[in-house]
Amino acid sequence: MKAVIQAGGKGTRISEITGDVIPKPMLEISGYPILYHQMMNLKKNGITDITVIIGHLGNVIKDYFGDGKQFGLNISYVEEDPQKPLGTAGSLYFLKDKIKENFVFLLADVFIDIDFEKMEQYHIANNADVTLLTHPNGHPFDSDLVVEEGGVVKAFDYKSNDRTT
């Protein structure tokens, strides 16, 4: 299984901390960037072939990780035009002819530690086209929202600064 990591966002909500000189996934936790921790979790789960979709400040990510060999990974990059971002799903369009098998898709600024093999087993057992892992949060007004019923996604609402609840 391969992994695709979306790392092209501007990180506007955290720009006071990043100073718009490093992308949000490069913020450090315990001495390493969030993105490093994600990649090491993928490696722990046997996933070493990773495509990173970069955009705003993507050069910082490329300079740090390179081709991934020093981390025991095989990293490739797809560059999204930072002036014309396509959004989370839109950026996957770049990969429509490149990845034909199941893959894990992660947002680069989310710090998670899950068993991807179990998630893939669930995906296959349910004959799913897409398996989506979500979590509740305390700030729905500035987050993407997924409306589900009985384990089936019914709607997706992109974050909007106009939403108050």
Would you name each region that the model predicts?
Residues D20-Y36:
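Short catalytic helix/loop segments, enriched in acidic residues and glycine
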Residues T12, N59, K154:
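Glycine-centered loop/turn positions within well-structured domains
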Residues M1-D20, K43:
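N-terminal nucleotide-binding beta1-loop-alpha1 segment
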Residues P25, N74-S76, V152:
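Conserved beta-strand segments of alpha/beta enzyme cores
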Residues D113-T165:
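Conserved core of the sugar-phosphate nucleotidyltransferase
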Residues K2-I5, Y32-F111, F116-K118:
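Conserved N-terminal catalytic core of the sugar/cofactor nucleotidyltransferase
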Residues E28, Y77-E79, L132, A155:
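Structural signal for conserved beta-strand scaffold positions within catalytic alpha/beta enzyme cores
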Residues T18-V21, I75-Y77:
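Short glycine/proline- and charge-enriched loop/turn segments
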